């Protein structure tokens, strides 16, 4: 037990020397025994290292500019003018409240190293001294365009003249004065038709659809008329003509039976060939038969 207590006291003394464990006067040996004597030193992990490195990089990227405070300047106005936050200005100038700003003659402003402000003001490399020579921002801003004022004014004047010419041409091209409403409507419709091809893409019609064999609606209508009207009409006419021919044939046959003296042209042909019209009897014998039929009483 004595050796174990000596080892624990030695380890605790080493820990106290490192500054990680604080002992209190009320602590006893029993309390120290209950607690875990093995205490390890915590090391910073990757995220904390990255945070520290990023914070250092941010501090290195910041450049401090000084500006003389003039009448009408406020803390918010300076922050808006130099694109920074009020908290950053307070932190750099050790300001507790906004009222402390009015007690200063010059103010330090944190600005990023690579920005438009650093390019225009030409600050010193790195951080400046606590009291550097003041840089008149407004005077330099006035002097920079003063060197190029003639060329800039000439270019601006020429640009404005060109704009005026373009406006005059547009006004001449678009004459809005119309005498009648019809002219207004025609002008608006012409403009609408002019702008329609730009907005709408022209879809090319495919002449072959597959199901209708590439036929249009008018060809379908013509086919329906032919099938539904013209074909039945021709059919009826054909059968009417056939019926008339049959009726005329039957009428000629009936007339030949009713009037035996009238011989049809076929009988005349048979007589010309010396053949009887009925049973192939010669003409002389036919006369004898006629005489026999005409005088039956004479024979009696």
Curated annotation (Swiss-Prot):
<feature type="glycosylation site" description="N-linked (GlcNAc...) asparagine">
    <location>
        <position position="26"/>
    </location>
</feature>
<dbReference type="InterPro" id="IPR018392">
    <property type="entry name" value="LysM_dom"/>
</dbReference>
<dbReference type="GO" id="GO:0042834">
    <property type="term" value="F:peptidoglycan binding"/>
</dbReference>
<keyword id="KW-0812">Transmembrane</keyword>
<dbReference type="InterPro" id="IPR036779">
    <property type="entry name" value="LysM_dom_sf"/>
</dbReference>
<feature type="glycosylation site" description="N-linked (GlcNAc...) asparagine">
    <location>
        <position position="7"/>
    </location>
</feature>
<dbReference type="GO" id="GO:0005794">
    <property type="term" value="C:Golgi apparatus"/>
</dbReference>
<protein>
    <recommendedName>
        <fullName>LysM and putative peptidoglycan-binding domain-containing protein 3</fullName>
    </recommendedName>
</protein>
<feature type="compositionally biased region" description="Basic and acidic residues">
    <location>
        <begin position="286"/>
        <end position="300"/>
    </location>
</feature>
<dbReference type="InterPro" id="IPR045030">
    <property type="entry name" value="LYSM1-4"/>
</dbReference>
<keyword id="KW-1003">Cell membrane</keyword>
<dbReference type="Pfam" id="PF01476">
    <property type="entry name" value="LysM"/>
</dbReference>
<feature type="transmembrane region" description="Helical">
    <location>
        <begin position="217"/>
        <end position="237"/>
    </location>
</feature>
<keyword id="KW-1133">Transmembrane helix</keyword>
<keyword id="KW-0597">Phosphoprotein</keyword>
<dbReference type="GO" id="GO:0007030">
    <property type="term" value="P:Golgi organization"/>
</dbReference>
<feature type="region of interest" description="Disordered">
    <location>
        <begin position="136"/>
        <end position="157"/>
    </location>
</feature>
<feature type="region of interest" description="Disordered">
    <location>
        <begin position="253"/>
        <end position="300"/>
    </location>
</feature>
<feature type="modified residue" description="Phosphoserine">
    <location>
        <position position="55"/>
    </location>
</feature>
<comment type="function">
    <text>Essential for Golgi structural integrity.</text>
</comment>
<keyword id="KW-0472">Membrane</keyword>
<keyword id="KW-0325">Glycoprotein</keyword>
<feature type="glycosylation site" description="N-linked (GlcNAc...) asparagine">
    <location>
        <position position="199"/>
    </location>
</feature>
<dbReference type="GO" id="GO:0000139">
    <property type="term" value="C:Golgi membrane"/>
</dbReference>
<keyword id="KW-0333">Golgi apparatus</keyword>
<feature type="topological domain" description="Cytoplasmic">
    <location>
        <begin position="238"/>
        <end position="300"/>
    </location>
</feature>
<feature type="domain" description="LysM">
    <location>
        <begin position="65"/>
        <end position="109"/>
    </location>
</feature>
<feature type="compositionally biased region" description="Polar residues">
    <location>
        <begin position="140"/>
        <end position="156"/>
    </location>
</feature>
<feature type="topological domain" description="Extracellular">
    <location>
        <begin position="1"/>
        <end position="216"/>
    </location>
</feature>
<dbReference type="GO" id="GO:0005886">
    <property type="term" value="C:plasma membrane"/>
</dbReference>
């Amino acid at each position: 037990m004595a050796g174990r207590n000596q080892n624990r006291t030695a380890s605790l003394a080493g820990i106290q020397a490192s500054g990680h464990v604080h002992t209190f006067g009320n602590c006893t040996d029993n309390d120290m025994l209950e607690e875990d004597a093995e205490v390890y030193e915590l090391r910073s992990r990757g995220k904390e290292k990255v945070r520290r490195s990023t914070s250092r990089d941010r501090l290195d990227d910041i450049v401090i500019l000084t500006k003389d405070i003039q009448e009408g300047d406020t803390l918010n106005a300076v922050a808006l003018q130099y694109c920074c936050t009020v908290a950053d200005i307070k932190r750099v100038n050790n300001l507790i409240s906004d009222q402390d700003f009015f007690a200063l003659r010059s103010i330090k402003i944190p600005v990023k190293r690579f920005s438009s402000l650093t390019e225009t003001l030409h600050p010193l490399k790195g951080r400046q001294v606590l009291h550097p020579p003041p840089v008149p921002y407004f005077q330099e801003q006035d002097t920079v365009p003063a060197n190029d004022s003639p060329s800039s004014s000439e270019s601006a004047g020429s640009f404005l003249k060109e704009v005026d010419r373009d406006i005059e041409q547009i006004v001449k091209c678009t004459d809005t004065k119309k005498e009648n409403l019809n002219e207004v409507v025609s002008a608006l419709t012409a403009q609408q038709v002019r702008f329609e091809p730009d907005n709408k893409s022209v879809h090319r019609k495919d002449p072959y659809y597959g199901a209708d064999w590439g036929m249009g609606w008018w060809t379908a209508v013509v086919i329906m008329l032919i099938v539904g009207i013209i074909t039945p009409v021709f059919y009826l006419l054909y059968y009417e003509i056939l019926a008339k021919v049959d009726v005329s044939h039957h009428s000629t046959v009936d007339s030949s039976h009713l009037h035996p003296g009238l011989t049809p042209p076929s009988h005349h042909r048979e007589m010309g060939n010396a053949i009887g019209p009925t049973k192939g009897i010669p003409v002389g014998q036919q006369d004898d038969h006629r005489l026999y039929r005409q005088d039956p009483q004479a024979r009696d």
